[in-house]
């Protein structure tokens, strides 16, 4: 058997996994996922731009096929798939992805709807004008290069980057164990911030944010609040909220409202937003939208959302912000590579790193240019020396038998020149010698040795240079280069001069590429709830027996005298009638108790506002009611308190007391409020403080009055205890929690009513048959409702035909318990009173 290996090294698999994974992680972090703080580019983007530079694919040259660039990148610099490289190119060319595109694309490069770009064989690209500033001076030894994957090419480790690209275009990427998400900014603001930081490196963040107030996204939008921005700039991490920009349009003729969305948050897909809105409408999570269409064109974005007349556009818009990507959170995590290591960086650290990078670039560029100029000066000096001694040089060359002899004679001769001076200056500044300067051998003020480079240039000198004019030109160029050399030396020696050059270059970039901010920052933003958009108004809420609900402004009803005919409050079908009526504020929460003892939550303003003649909307469309379940009691509340109880009564005389605090957490599907027997239902709900008295009234005119203390507090799912004993033919119709002042108002089905003093109802024990509250006859009919009233009150009475009358309590007489009352509302033969509610006189406005 042949040997598989000559030597087997045993290693711990745990250690090998750790080391291998660490190597992989660092490779991803440094070589793929994170940008360099200096030029703001990941390796793939840097290599794409470098490949375009090598191909001379500049902004002012013709376009080249994307496939050509992709081929060069993966063949020379980036040994990865062509899809990854082309995807990077596409993103660099998308104006909705980058604040300042680095590639000028021609063809289909995708859309904000998420459409894919055309294949690379169809699209053409070239470098954008601003990208050229990233690569400018690359050929002046400004950055270091390293070998590519096979050692055949050289790649820059970073670009010179005249622009602060990391901030103006941002970056995002997921590495191993870390990620980065840096938002784009406005170039004018960032450069102004750079200039301020250069002038004062101890500048406060508050002062710096006067120049750089926050991110500026290519898709514009609205940033709500500055707290997240400040935190991100201070710590490197933060969260901001970006909202779409919208307006509400009102048609002149129809007065119909439409919500127009004309800017979306950054990186939000327009098509998905529209689809999401459509799904919300379909699932009835948002009510009131009639039409949804996309009218976007080359002029800009325009999503039109038409809504119903009776629907408040502000509420719909707030729901859209809450339920769709019209408002998103953007987590800022400013992680970048600095000195080859990933680091979470603050705004000042990023600016400082960029400025230090620019200092090094300018110094290396200046040194490169100085060496180049000194080399040229060196050659020019040799030519000037030769022209000053042209006759002697020609004679030496003529007398030489070979080229080598001529070079040797020129090299060893002591030459005189009245124009050459560079070598003498260098003699006085020996500390600044470059490799080219060290080749010079000064003798004295006006005598020189020629170097091999100078001798070669002399031997290659064209005869036309021997003219007097050409001689003067050489001397002029020599002096000009000498001045330039001095300037470059000053840059290297004087930090203030270098700083001025850096600032001048930044100002030039700002002036050439600066534009207006797109994203608006709402500095004084505070979270806006839907309720903030709703006026606080008192409304009449009606719920029909068939489950149609709506509200109307209370001020739309005028008070009438006793015996009035009333005003139509709601149009119902013949078989339907109003079962619940209450007055509440638009900002109240209504607790909706169903016939099955389930409690549902709803804001008053979430109910449909409708006219008097409208039936409203089925409440089953607003609440997740099951089959054979209907809302039987509604209780408006403004806040939850543990000291307050919800007291419930059923038609079979059962009562229950539970803390209001137990109902504070709304659930979409509702919660159990009371366990009911099969033939029982909830008829009344009220708030108590633990020391109230309770009154229950039956349809047959009986009443019981007992202390709340007799009913102990129980949990939500309890069945309760007996409050009043009733006959099988009777049922409880009202629950009253009496206050200190006022009377008890009773209304019958035939429109009779009366007021009775509370003290006429003695406080006794619960679970008794009670006392007579009203004399029941065929003339007045059974009791349909009772309530406590005071002299200033007004009441609203409604019939099963939809007729509503509003009258003052003072017009209703005070009578004893064993009386049938007086006519309050005249009803027709088939018409019956079905609901009673109090309207506070302080809130009434006659019309």
From Swiss-Prot:
GO terms for biological process: DNA topological change; DNA-templated DNA replication. It is found in: Cytoplasm. One of its GO terms (cellular component) is DNA topoisomerase type II (double strand cut, ATP-hydrolyzing) complex. It catalyses: ATP-dependent breakage, passage and rejoining of double-stranded DNA. Residues 34-533 form the Topo IIA-type catalytic domain. The keyword Ribonucleoprotein does not apply. The keyword Isomerase applies. Keywords: ATP-binding, Cytoplasm, DNA-binding, Isomerase, Nucleotide-binding, Topoisomerase. GO terms for molecular function: ATP binding; DNA binding; DNA negative supercoiling activity. The active site is at 122 (o-(5'-phospho-dna)-tyrosine intermediate). Its EC number is 5.6.2.2. Pfam families: DNA_gyraseA_C, DNA_topoisoIV. It is an enzyme of class 5 (isomerase). Heterotetramer, composed of two GyrA and two GyrB chains. In the heterotetramer, GyrA contains the active site tyrosine that forms a transient covalent intermediate with DNA, while GyrB binds cofactors and catalyzes ATP hydrolysis. HAMAP family: GyrA (MF_01897). NCBIfam families: gyrA, PRK05560.1, PRK05561.1. Belongs to the type II topoisomerase GyrA/ParC subunit family. Few gyrases are as efficient as E.coli at forming negative supercoils. Not all organisms have 2 type II topoisomerases; in organisms with a single type II topoisomerase this enzyme also has to decatenate newly replicated chromosomes. This is DNA gyrase subunit A.
